[in-house]
Amino acid sequence: MEKLFIEGGRPLHGSVKISGAKNAALPLMAATLLAPGKHILRNVPELRDTKTLLQVMAELGVTSQRDGDVLTIDSTHLKHCEASYDLVRTMRASVLVLGPLVARLGQARVSKPGGCAIGDRPINLHLMGLETLGAKCIQEHGYVDVEVDGRLQGGTIYFDVPSVTGTENLLMAATLAEGTTVLQNAAREPEIANLVDMLVGMGARIEGRDSDELTIHGVEQLGQADCVIIPDRIEAGTYLIAIAASGGAGKVTHCQPEHLSALLTKLRATGLLLEADESTISISFPEGKTVSDLSCVDIKTMPYPGYATDLQAQFMALMCLATGSSVVNETIFENRFMHVAELERMNADIKINGGSAVVTGNGVAGLVGAPVMATDLRASSSLVIAGLAATGQTEVRRIYHLERGYEKLEEKLTGLGARVWKEQS
């Protein structure tokens, strides 16, 4: 198993190009199951998660070919409807094939994803929505079996809480339903807007893009897709925080700053200088200021356009380097402080109280390198950020979590001047 080693204390400088968004690529890949033909997706990141979903789709009879960041998916010969446990257990997003399979084939058999390191994320919302559209759902022996006689039927679905994958799954299913479907209190993430754009390009009739109410007028069939994946806002935010934590200055390119408004507001509140244009964000310190001079800032995770839960751990690592106390409130997942114990191994001072964590920063000299273990994707990136700022060497284990969501991480950090390398254990 590989480990990532980081030699701390080297300020990052330069620019880093942001890859396509993992959280957009996965639903758009699943959406190609809705229609036969060759579908072209551009700016697709090469990640452990995208590879896993391609394996799931291969089991269904789909073929694919990658040329750089262009992925061609041929779903002409889609014939199987079962997503097996061996693959679904490694990535919860595999459940995104459920809606498209039921809509196109009239049936689907998908392994239940099981538990998740960062909290309970049941698929009940997906199933209740499909039942509203006329499907029969049975859960037994670790699988979900969904069937419908004929076409799905339009209906009104209300989400008690905005669910990103639930919105995506039911949005895809509804495109081929008979009649009109309304999704109320739907999630509003930019990745969902990206999916809407792709589906409309395939011939779907959808109203309400960027809003919490989506109206889908079902059509009998969809055509082939040719769509560009939006930039990864979480990757962009991670690198901005990493540059700040290292005490450096730089910029992220090929991003969409409007998708990061909440983070940029919080970073400016710490005293950092940020400038953004159409596709680039620059970050630096005021003259004569260092990481230790940063103001402590509280954050509260919220559904988009609020502060993203996927950037909570990274911001916490930055606050460990400020001087004073800040509060991190996590409202999306009930168990998303697993990185705290590992940060404490690096001398961080963090106290957890339910869904809140109080971070007492001790300045740039507060963190020291240590062996740490990644527990999930975003927790692992917070450990990398802490390692970049810490005194001495940090060893991050279980880096397969990083490979799920960060394309060419080692190469990109090295390009910014970091001293990072991988070794086999």
Curated annotation (Swiss-Prot):
Binding site for UDP-N-acetyl-alpha-D-glucosamine: R92, D310, I332
Principal location class: cytoplasm
Any GO BP: peptidoglycan biosynthetic process
GO terms, molecular function: UDP-N-acetylglucosamine 1-carboxyvinyltransferase activity
Enzyme class: transferase
Entry's EC annotation: 2.5.1.7
Record: active site: C116 (proton donor)
Pathway: Cell wall biogenesis; peptidoglycan biosynthesis
Modified sites of kind 2-(S-cysteinyl)pyruvic acid O-phosphothioketal: C116
Family named by the database record: Belongs to the EPSP synthase family. MurA subfamily.
NCBIfam families: murA, PRK09369.1
Protein name: UDP-N-acetylglucosamine 1-carboxyvinyltransferase
Upper classification of the organism: Bacteria, Pseudomonadati, Thermodesulfobacteriota, Desulfobulbia, Desulfobulbales
